[in-house]
Every structure is written in C-alpha cells, then in structure tokens.
C-alpha cells in the first residue's frame, strides 16, 4: 500500500499542475495544456500501475495466509483461489459384438418351427453351447400345452368409397 499518496504530496502535485496566474500567449497556452495533459496522463498511468501492484500484493498475501490451514478445512471449496481437481475421464462405452449373434439366426426373429427344431435337436437358436435361450426354455416348459394368444385390436381404415382395409393395431 505504498502507492497511496499522502495529502501533502497531493497538494504539491495539484500546485504543479495548476495553470499559472499570468495569461500566456495562445501558442504557449496550447503547449502548456499539452504538457499538463501529458503530465496528468502520466500520473494516471502511475496510479494505475501502483493500484495493480497493490492488488497483486494483496492476492499474494491472502494466498500465503490461506495455504496450510484453510485449504484442509475448506469443504465448500469457495473463495480460496484453488482450483478443483478434475476427475479422470472414464472411457466411453463401446458395444461388444459377438459374431455368433449374427451368424446363427440367418435374419429375422425366431418362429415356433425354429423353437421346436431347437428343442428336439437339443440345440439353442443362439449357438452358445451350455446356455439356454429364453425361447428354448419357454418351449421346453410348454411341452405341447396350448397357449392362447393375446387379443388384437383391429382398426378399419377406409381408402375411398366402398373400399376398406383392416389393419392390426400395433399395441
């Protein structure tokens, strides 16, 4: 805080920057104005740099005072000037594909014929040995039981006069 000026220094600088009491010729007056404006600008620059130096000194002082004790006790993490430690980024999820999933089915979903063939041969439709698929397990549990399907809602759509088409509802 050494950059602050005492009141005595301020009055001295004001006295030096004030205009002389005797009138000057126009050429000398403009020259005197430019020198006073340059002096004022120089003083403003000096005050600005002194202010910046004071701010830096205060920041350093508070940073040194807060190092050992406050940072350990500071749970909220605010105001200490320290940065939060960043967590390491987790690797993005990558799907794991197995070729057996794509090779065996030949496309589409499983039909009842496929399930029956898999249960009679003892093979699973997913080609994984030692594991039973849900479809294969369900087919083994049924063993010829008749299961009724869910009721399906049908919507009738008219395509024009005298034409209608039935479409099953996708519920």
From Swiss-Prot:
It is found in: Nucleus. Residues 1-12 have a biased composition (Basic and acidic residues). Keywords: Nucleus, Plant defense. Its main location: nucleus. One of its GO terms (biological process) is regulation of systemic acquired resistance. GO terms for cellular component: nucleus. Residues 26-43 have a biased composition (Acidic residues). Residues 1-45, 65-94, 119-143 are annotated as: Disordered. Pfam families: NPR1_interact (PF15699). Belongs to the NPR1-interactor family. Binds to and weakly represses NPR1/NH1-mediated transcriptional activation of LG2 in vitro. Interacts with NPR1/NH1. Interacts with NPR3/NH3. This is NRR repressor homolog 2.
